[in-house]
C-alpha cells in the first residue's frame, strides 16, 4: 500500500527531480532518494524504502515543480524557497503578500492585509485549509525545513496577533 494515499499500485523505484530550489543542483534535487548502500534498509533498494506508487510520486513532484515555477505560489531566498497553496485559489497569494509586500489598493488581498495590520480580521469567508512549506536544497537532495497547515482564518489570527505584539507605541 502507498504510504501517502493507501492505494495499491506499482511502486516508484526513483522519484523525479524537484527544480528551482536554492542550494540544489541546476538539474534539480530529489526529495526522496536512497542511492548509497548505507541508506538502504533491510536489503531494500531505491523506492522500496518508501512505499509510494508511481501515481503519488508523479503527483507530488509535479505539484512542487509547478509551485516553484509559478511566482504567485512561492518566495525564493538565498538558502531556500517557501511554497504555499490553498483550497481557494484566490487566497493563495496571502503568504506572498504577508512576507513579500503588498498588492495594489484595489485588489482584495490589499484589503485583507490592511485589516490585519490594524489588528482586525477580514470580512470575508475563508477557505478551509492553507498550506506553507519551506524547502532547502543541498546538492542533489531537497529537504523540507518546515510544513505548516491551518485554516486561513487561523493563520490570519496568528499574523494579526504577531503584528499587534510588534506594534510600537509612538
Task: Describe the role of every protein-language-model region.
Residues 5-7:
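Short Cys/His-rich metal-coordination motifs, predominantly Zn2+-binding knuckles/fingers
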Residues 9-170:
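Extended alpha-helical scaffolding segments
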Amino acid at each position: 500500500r502507498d504510504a501517502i494515499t493507501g492505494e495499491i499500485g506499482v511502486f516508484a523505484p526513483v522519484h523525479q527531480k524537484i527544480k528551482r530550489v536554492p542550494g540544489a543542483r541546476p538539474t534539480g534535487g530529489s526529495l526522496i532518494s536512497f542511492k548509497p548502500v548505507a541508506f538502504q534498509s533491510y536489503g531494500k533498494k531505491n523506492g522500496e524504502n518508501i512505499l509510494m506508487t508511481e501515481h503519488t510520486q508523479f503527483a507530488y513532484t509535479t505539484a512542487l515543480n509547478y509551485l516553484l515555477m509559478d511566482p504567485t505560489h512561492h518566495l525564493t531566498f538565498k538558502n531556500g524557497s517557501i511554497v504555499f497553496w490553498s483550497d481557494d485559489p484566490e487566497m493563495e497569494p496571502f503568504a506572498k503578500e504577508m512576507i513579500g509586500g503588498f498588492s495594489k489598493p484595489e485588489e482584495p488581498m490589499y484589503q485583507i492585509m490592511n485589516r490585519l495590520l490594524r489588528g482586525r480580521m477580514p470580512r470575508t469567508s475563508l477557505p478551509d485549509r492553507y498550506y506553507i512549506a519551506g524547502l532547502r536544497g543541498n546538492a542533489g537532495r531537497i529537504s523540507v525545513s518546515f510544513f505548516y497547515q491551518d485554516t486561513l482564518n487561523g493563520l490570519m489570527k496568528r499574523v494579526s496577533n504577531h503584528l499587534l505584539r510588534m506594534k510600537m507605541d509612538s
